[in-house]
Amino acid sequence: MMKKFVAAGVLAVSSMLASQWGMAATLEYDMRTLAIGYKTFSGSDNAQQATAALTKMRAAALDSKKQAPAKVQKDPQQLKAYYAGVDQLVGEIDKTNALVKAGKLAQAKQEGKKLLDIRDTNHKKFR
């Protein structure tokens, strides 16, 4: 009886830890996807490549809203600010992508530099 109780407790704790680890890995993956996407976008020499990179970045940014950093999850104000930062990033990605689609790749790359500013600002707040 005692062995079953201990085994159940270990299983429950393991499940909780695995769940938290899985969420962190997903958020880390989204952030890595954003970084790789930006590098691809900034080095692109055609609209198709730039649009593909920005599209992947947008999807990763939206996915990152599904799981906030652990320290942010505990504070409703911080969580609201985190979501606002992600929304700002998505808005800037959309603005940059609109320039690419309008055939203004050079201007889009200049506008896209704001993505780094948004990243840096939000990393200071939430990392």
Q: Each PLM stretch: what is its role?
A:
Residues 11-12, 22:
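Cleavable N-terminal signal peptides
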Residues 10-11, 126:
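Enrichment for repetitive, rod-forming helical segments
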Residues 24-127:
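Mature extracytoplasmic or organellar-lumen-exposed domains after removal of signal/transit peptides
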Residues 17-19:
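N-terminal signal peptide c-region/cleavage motif recognized by signal peptidases
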Residues 1-10:
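Bacterial N-terminal signal peptides that target proteins for export
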